[in-house]
Structures are given as C-alpha cells and as structure tokens.
Curated annotation (Swiss-Prot):
Organism listed in the record: Mycobacterium ulcerans (strain Agy99)
Residues that bind FMN: R138, A139, S140, Q259, A260, G303, K318, P319, I320, S321, T322, R344
Protein name as catalogued: Chorismate synthase
This protein's encoding gene: aroC
Record field: transmembrane: none
GO biological process, one term: amino acid biosynthetic process
Subunit text: Homotetramer.
UniProt-listed HAMAP family: Chorismate_synth (MF_00300)
Domain of life: Bacteria
NCBIfam families documented for this protein: aroC, PRK05382.1
Pathway: Metabolic intermediate biosynthesis; chorismate biosynthesis; chorismate from D-erythrose 4-phosphate and phosphoenolpyruvate: step 7/7
Coiled coil ranges: none
Keywords associated with the record: Amino-acid biosynthesis, Aromatic amino acid biosynthesis, FAD, Flavoprotein, FMN, Lyase, NADP
Annotated spans, Disordered: 275-308
EC number(s) from the headed UniProt entry: 4.2.3.5
Amino acid sequence: MLRWITAGESHGRALVALVDGMVAGVEVTSTEIADQLARRRLGYGRGARMAFERDAVTVLSGIRHGSTLGGPIAIEIGNTEWPKWEAVMAADPLDPAAAAELENSARNAPLTRPRPGHADYAGMLKYGFDDARPVLERASARETAARVAAGTVARAFLRQALGVEVLSHVVSIGASAPYDGPPPQPEDLLAIDASPVRAFDGQAEKSMIAEIEAAKKDGDTLGGVVEVVALGLPVGLGSFTSGENRLDSQLAAAVMGIQAIKGVEIGDGFETARRRGSRAHDEMYPGTDGVVRSTNRAGGLEGGMTNGQPLRVRAAMKPISTVPKALATVDLATGDEAVAIHQRSDVCAVPAAAVVVETMVALVLARVTLEKFGGDSLAETRRNIEAYQRSVADREAPAARARAIRG
C-alpha cells in the first residue's frame, strides 16, 4: 500500500517527505520535484517570504539515476534561512552563553497571543505549551512543500502507468465572480501557470487581482476556491463496498487535511443538491466503443468509483488567519485582552493551494491505482492495467457489436 508522511518545522533545518510502497522503474528526478515546488511558490498576493524562500531539494533514498528502486523514497527540502533560526530551533539544549544570548533575541520572543483561525490556541492548550512557537512551526502551510515533493513521485507514476494528467486552476478568490466554463486540458497548464492567479479565464483573472489589491490595501487576507481535474482515469478505481474504500471519502479526507481548506466537493457537489434528480445525473448512451455521456455532473465518480469521466475536485480555502489588521484575542500569559500575533504572511495563497490540492489528489489516485493493479515494478503494473482495460472493453464490446449488426 502506498503511504506518505512528512516531517519538519517551518523554520527548521529541513522538511522531509517519505514515500513508501512506490513500484520500481518510475522515472522521476530532483529537477522535476524542484519544478513542482516552484509552482507552489507561484501566485499574486504572496508574502515577502516567497522573495527569498528557495527549496533546496535532495533525494536521500529510493531513487537511482532518475528511476525509483521500489524501496522507501526520502526527499529533503532544505531551509535556506536555517542559519538565522539555528539557535531558536536547535534540537539539542544550548550552552549557557548561547542560551543567554537567545533570551534577548526578538526571534525567540514568546508568542502568547494566539491567532483566531489558526492552530495556536488549541495546540497550546492540548500540548501544554506556554508559547505558540512549537504549534505554528508544524502547523504552518510551509509543510505542504514536503507534500508537493511526495506528490511529484505520484504524478510521475500516474502519467507513466496510466497516461493520467492532474492539473488545477483557481475558480475564484474572495468575492470575485467564479469561473463557470469547461475544465482545462493538459495543454492549458502552461497558460494557467503563467497567470498571476493561476486563472483559466482572462476576465476571471482581472476580477481576482482586483480582489487581492483591495484586500491588501485594507490590511486583510483572502481565501478562494480551486478545482483539480484528473484526465485519463480508467473505470473502477475505488470501491462501493465500504465507506473508507470509497474514492470520494479518500479524496475528501486528503484534501481537507491541507491547511486552511474548509470544504471539498466532487463534480457539481453542492449545486447538485439544489437540482431535481432528472437534472442531477449523467445519462448514458450507446457509443461506437461503449457507453458515452453528455454531461459530467458527478465529476467522474459514482458509487465511490471512477466511471471513466474526468475527475473534478473543488476545494474551498479560508482566508489566511495571520491578518495584518490584527484580530482580537487573549494573551494566554496574562489573561488580558490583546491583539493577535502577526508575522509576515501572504494576502492570498489560493493559487499555491491549487498546486497542493493537485498533489493530494495525485497521491490518493496513485494509492488506489496500486491497490487495484499491484505490481513490484512499473512494467508489471502496466501489464495488469492493460489486462484489466481489455477486460472492461470486452464487457462493453458485445453490445457495441450487436448494435453494429443491427445497423
């Protein structure tokens, strides 16, 4: 079974991603990982950190000469600002002189005014911390860089095993008019990444930028909605047999686990709930090579399984909780009214969030693909996929042949 985990703190020495269960023979390089990490840094409205943050990628294990080995894959993303934070984030106790110097450092000042909407408050109480630093270091969205690194391996596997492409775009930011056109195709990805807000429509882009400019002027932050599309998936990934095996639930759990994501929908999602049944589902018709559909309201999933249509997943991101116009809070050191701590932050990170949602969708799809088709090498997995696809085609073919004979 494909598994992944990340480790590291926002200002620590490095982030680490560990991927276990990937087959041998998948071609992926550190350059590809770095390219995906660069996409995560894209977006109008990002903060000052993006100007100097660099993701120094080192593959520690599991890949040799650009090909996976079948063992655990470990990827390190170094923190180029580590020298500034080494004393604050040191793993071992400091010597008395260094500890005394750190005592007077602004970087080490206790953070006792939790930010509404962040993990600070509950984390401090749950783990018994007097300072929010241990909470925010791990809760920070900086951790998603490690997920993107892991997801790069999953994307490479999906492309090489199934020909699947996973891409995303921003649907709306703040109160901007949402994009309501057809989903993008792989050939559109370069243009989307070239957009400062990763929009798939020029008018939508202008509306989103205007929202960001207004929020920046007001000292505020913005959320938004992103959509991920996966193209080329076969019928039958996932299962109807139990709740945890339904692909819907797996995707929703993975995407909701991203920092600041507060809602997930598959296909037309909540809009479907407002329709009558006759207008909510995707009717099927006989085609030359099997079943065809005129709509994709279900977003490629029915009964917890892929149905051969493009997968569409949307995620809603809340506004960033580190608000320049600081919100009211309580100083947990004194119990007094206070304003929340404020560190440098983005006005809007929705374009970057779209890339992270891509990552989590790719990881889940790679996992269910390996659960379905197995194999120790990419070649073996491909053989299993090809045999399954022939079987599916054969099940549809008799009906198609019968229609041809009748015609």
